[in-house]
Amino acid sequence: MTAQRRPTPHSSIWNSSMRKTLLRAACMAALTFMLSGCGIIDYFYLPPPEDTAQELYESGNDAMREKDYVAAAQAYTRLKDNYPFSPYTIEAELSLADAYFLDEEYPAAAEAYKEFETLHPRHQAIPYVLYQVGMARLKSFISVDRPVNNVQEAYQYFQRLRESYPGTEYAAKAEEHMKECRRLLAERELFIADVYWRTGKYGAAWQRYSFVRDNFKDVPHAVEYATEKANVAYLRHREAQSENIREAREGSWKQWFKWL
């Protein structure tokens, strides 16, 4: 009969130590998995950290240098909306208007420049802002057969700039654009007068031509054309009136004879 081998004290101690080591390793593995799991959860379910005001400002400036004006406008808008009191915000507001202007989004540019003036009426860039509003409105002009409210507003802003900031470089530029606005407004009036002329409405045409002759003396070619057309339109208008009177008289006699 074979005797059973009894465990020695050394083997018992070793087994106990081994169990503790394995348990410790298992705990570390579980902790590592949990931490990595939290990282995965954060990655997929938590929103990414927002860009700082400085990062958004620099991103917008980089996009402007690359002439990616849409991306620039987006960056400046995020900065303006998320960090309204940042030291970068004022410059971002003006740069946003510039981005719209350079992207030829002239109505949006005009509104952005106007908003800047409203928020910062004493800012040193106001002469530039007034000039840019005028330019944005002027560039919105399409043709003389469309409403010219944008041209009228452009003229008003250029005039404000010239009167309020006469010594600035932008006031000198505004002077030339005011002449352009006056020319376009005169041509608009002549276009309407010509429509009346072509449709035989000589009285209305004469009034429009006369208006240009009397109110646009700073546009010589328009005054010359309007004066010539006004004279002829007036004569034709009087002729038409005389013809109407004659027809009315003849018509009354015809009616009288029919009654007899």
Swiss-Prot record:
GO cellular component terms listed in the entry, alphabetical order: cell outer membrane
Segments crossing the lipid bilayer: none
One Pfam family per UniProt: YfiO
InterPro entries recorded: BamD, BamD-like, TPR-like_helical_dom_sf, TPR_rpt
Record's signal peptide: 1-37
Keywords linked to the UniProt accession: Cell outer membrane, Membrane, Signal
Compartments where located: Cell outer membrane
Keyword Secreted: no
Subunit structure comment from the entry: Part of the Bam complex.
General function of this protein: Part of the outer membrane protein assembly complex, which is involved in assembly and insertion of beta-barrel proteins into the outer membrane.
Family to which the UniProt record says this protein belongs: Belongs to the BamD family.
PANTHER family noted in UniProt: CELL DIVISION COORDINATOR CPOB, SOLUBLE LYTIC MUREIN TRANSGLYCOSYLASE-RELATED
Record-given protein name: Outer membrane protein assembly factor BamD
Protein encoded by which gene: bamD
